[in-house]
Curated annotation (Swiss-Prot):
SUPFAM superfamilies documented for this protein: Ribulose-phoshate binding barrel
E.C. numbers: 4.2.1.20
Organism the protein comes from: Salmonella arizonae (strain ATCC BAA-731 / CDC346-86 / RSK2980)
HAMAP family recorded: Trp_synth_alpha
Function: The alpha subunit is responsible for the aldol cleavage of indoleglycerol phosphate to indole and glyceraldehyde 3-phosphate.
Membrane-crossing segments per the record: none
Gene name in the database record: trpA
Annotated InterPro entries: Aldolase_TIM (IPR013785), RibuloseP-bd_barrel (IPR011060), Trp_synthase_alpha_AS (IPR018204), Trp_synthase_suA (IPR002028)
PROSITE patterns listed in its UniProt record: TRP_SYNTHASE_ALPHA (PS00167)
Protein name per Swiss-Prot or TrEMBL: Tryptophan synthase alpha chain
């Protein structure tokens, strides 16, 4: 959890927002996936948000569903994902690493065992996408026992009660939804969300990172200007992987590098 605190403190001093890319572990294969993640970090990513392949990702649109399918086609398992996480942590000791999960994967070997494994490989946070705040107690308690930040989604229609719960239970960062629905770069994020950001700050919530539909530098800049601590982009990045992974892996890495570089540059406002 301290890695998030350190990151946000450093970014505040530099007057920057965080840019956080999302990719699915093992997409389109383990070796390529590790190269992709190295490229994202080298291009300026401040933290990572990583998915573990899942057969029914309810919160995700077709782009990230396809990423899951590519990882499954490559035979990637949760065990291999944890091996990848250990390698990423060893190579990049200071970057915050977050997982975006679904509850079935957490339940597989028991909730406590899952978070213990996360701690062992150097994960900093876990967002369980299909567990609402009011049902989160066993997850967040296990997370805190193992020094993992429990992350909560703040929807655009959050009422005061929910905002207070998110502020009370969340650690690391708060995932602020640009809009309701599923992920997807084609579903543009409705920017900005001043009122929610102000309320989250008033209730001393973990810093807000805006996600869903973030696909251009202009949106990153707008999120930071609205008071968010940064932005998360997934589908736009996964689109680059989908477009190039079969035909031109080198072109894919070059495009990813320039995309992340531009998105990070936009966080400096």
């Amino acid at each position: 959890m301290e890695r998030y605190e350190n990151l946000f403190a450093q970014l505040n001093v530099r007057r920057e927002g965080a840019f956080v890319p999302f990719v699915t572990l093992g997409d389109p294969g383990i070796e390529q996936s590790l190269k992709i993640i190295d490229t994202l970090i080298d291009a300026g990513a401040d933290a990572l948000e990583l998915g573990v392949p899942f057969s029914d990702p309810l919160a995700d649109g077709p782009t990230i569903q396809n990423a899951n399918l590519r990882a499954f086609a490559a035979g990637v398992t949760p065990t291999q994902c944890f091996e990848m996480l250990a390698l990423i942590r060893e190579k990049h000791p200071t970057i915050p690493i977050g997982l975006l999960m679904y509850a079935n994967l957490v339940f597989n070997n028991g909730i406590d065992a899952f978070y213990a494994h996360c701690e062992k490989v150097g994960v900093d946070s876990v967002l369980v996408a299909d567990v609402p705040v009011e049902e989160s107690a066993p997850f967040r308690q296990a997370a805190l026992r193992h020094n993992i930040a429990p992350i909560f989604i703040c929807p655009p229609n959050a009422d005061d009660d929910l905002l207070r719960q998110i502020a009370s239970y969340g650690r690391g960062y708060t995932y602020l939804l640009s809009r309701s629905g599923v992920t997807g770069a084609e579903n543009r994020g409705a920017l900005p969300l001043h009122h929610l950001i102000e309320k989250l700050k008033e209730y001393h919530a973990a810093p807000a990172l805006q996600g869903f539909g973030i696909s251009s530098p202009v949106q990153v800049s707008a999120a930071v200007r609205a008071g968010a601590a940064g932005a998360i982009s997934g589908s736009a990045i996964v689109n680059i992987i989908e477009k190039n992974h079969n035909t031109s892996p080198d072109q894919m890495l070059a495009e990813l590098k320039s995309f992340v570089y531009a998105m990070k540059a936009a966080s400096r406002v």
